[in-house]
């Protein structure tokens, strides 16, 4: 019997109906590789192997061993490449689509890594509902939603109750999808000069991420007050105020009230 490790944030999805809903929610993948983070008890992995070849990253050696034993006992139409490695260091050379029941404690970092990675063309993941709602929020409600909208389209698909897991978590989870959009990527990559598109895209994402951290550092305070505290952006405050005037927005706006962060950042960098 496998015991979930609290240190790795393990809650294994065991409800067949929700496992099937996740598999059914996958978009057409050809020609993308399918990459999974976390093999868990192997329930989702085995269902995926009925439809796709799969590469799975798993840091827990005991779960890797259990998965190998399961594959010996039941043959699947497609092959599994099981990589015993921390998914935070995931690096693929070919375009891929990501799927995962994400560990709660590093879910945000893993999603941001995928959004920043030009090779990742989209993702279908489950995370704590509160986290999923932040990524899928509309307009400029928070830094995560702005980052997501800058590179693709996010959709909240369905909630998963604690009873669907072993052991059950204390909170609801949600499955959501992000599909990268080439036109949005092109706009993000145009922020900075780089010899290759993928490098420019990654630098553009990182620059926007850094800027948003400053803008949303204290969400209830005005944008101006937040940027005054930023070592990187306090000297650009006058240009921010100029931009707000051009957009007919008051100087007292909060970060969540900015209409177009990409346009603002482009103005600061090139204006």
Curated annotation (Swiss-Prot):
The entry marks the following residues as binding S-adenosyl-L-methionine, namely 11, 13, 38, 58, 86, 101
Q: Name one GO cellular component term.
A: cytosol
* Keywords assigned by UniProt, alphabetized: Cytoplasm, Methyltransferase, RNA-binding, rRNA processing, S-adenosyl-L-methionine, Transferase
The reply on keyword Transport is no
Is Metal-binding included in the keywords of this UniProt record?
no
Localization: Cytoplasm
Q: What is its EC number?
A: 2.1.1.182
Name one molecular function that GO assigns to this entry: RNA binding
- Give the reactions, separated by semicolons, that this protein catalyses: adenosine(1518)/adenosine(1519) in 16S rRNA + 4 S-adenosyl-L-methionine = N(6)-dimethyladenosine(1518)/N(6)-dimethyladenosine(1519) in 16S rRNA + 4 S-adenosyl-L-homocysteine + 4 H(+)
Its domain of life reads Bacteria
Q: What does the similarity note say?
A: Belongs to the class I-like SAM-binding methyltransferase superfamily. rRNA adenine N(6)-methyltransferase family. RsmA subfamily.
Q: What does this protein do?
A: Specifically dimethylates two adjacent adenosines (A1518 and A1519) in the loop of a conserved hairpin near the 3'-end of 16S rRNA in the 30S particle. May play a critical role in biogenesis of 30S subunits.
Task: State the protein's name.
Answer: Ribosomal RNA small subunit methyltransferase A
